[in-house]
């Protein structure tokens, strides 16, 4: 666990509408539609902080991680984070979303299919910046400033 100077009790959700079995054109259309949906209801989902992230995730239908456009949403509470997860899982066929807490960067995967209930899996470690030159292994995120992040 790490401690930051970020505001307390904020959840960040990393979410994508991409699917590895779809072409780039379809994935970009899905990405734009998801961003519009999120921005249209900030009270429900929180605020879109960046649409310019690259995530490398492994989908259940894929044997290896794939890179995809990713959005960072700042949620004021757990309910908003769950709403983002539910949107991703129901509308965009996502396996889960990554949620991390603002001050400690503790992270977990959240799956919320259907209209109620959810599953959360806490990940060992915390969502941390990876130093330049250090290798990236497995799943990671590159933010809008080119910084590399990973749960470690």
Curated annotation (Swiss-Prot):
Gene Ontology molecular function terms on file: S-adenosyl-L-methionine lyase activity; transferase activity
EC number, UniProt record: 4.4.1.42
The organism's place on the tree of life at top rank: Viruses
Alphabetical keyword list: Early protein, Host-virus interaction, Lyase, S-adenosyl-L-methionine, Transferase
Assembly mode: Homotetramer. Interacts with host METK; this interaction induces the polymerization of METK into filaments that are enzymatically inactive.
Catalytic activity line of the entry: S-adenosyl-L-methionine = L-homoserine lactone + S-methyl-5'-thioadenosine
Induction of synthesis: Expressed in the early phase of the viral replicative cycle.
Transmembrane segments: none
Known function: Degrades the intracellular SAM pools of the host cell and inhibits the host S-adenosylmethionine synthase METK/MAT, thereby preventing methylation of the viral genome. Induces the polymerization of METK into filaments that are enzymatically inactive. Keeping the viral genome in an unmethylated state allows the phage to shift from a lytic infection under normal growth conditions to a transient lysogenic infection under glucose starvation, by blocking its own expression. Does not protect the virus immune against host restriction-modification systems.
InterPro entries registered for this protein in UniProt: S-AdoMet_lyase (IPR016290)
Protein name: S-Adenosylmethionine lyase
Lineage: Viruses, Duplodnaviria, Heunggongvirae, Uroviricota, Caudoviricetes
């Amino acid at each position: 666990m790490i401690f930051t100077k970020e505001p307390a009790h904020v959840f960040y959700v990393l979410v994508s509408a991409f699917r590895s079995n779809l072409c780039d054109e379809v994935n970009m259309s899905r990405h734009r539609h998801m961003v519009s949906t999120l921005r249209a209801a900030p009270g429900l989902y929180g605020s879109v902080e960046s649409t310019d992230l690259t995530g490398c995730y492994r989908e259940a239908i894929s044997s290896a991680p794939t890179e995809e456009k990713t959005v960072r949403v700042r949620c004021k509470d757990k309910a908003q984070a769950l709403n983002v997860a539910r949107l991703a899982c129901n509308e965009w066929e996502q396996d889960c979303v990554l949620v991390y807490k603002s001050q400690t960067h503790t992270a977990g995967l959240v799956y919320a299919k259907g209209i109620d209930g959810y599953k959360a899996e806490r990940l060992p470690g915390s969502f941390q910046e990876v130093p330049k030159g250090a290798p990236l292994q497995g799943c990671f995120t590159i933010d809008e400033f080119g910084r590399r992040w990973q749960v470690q």
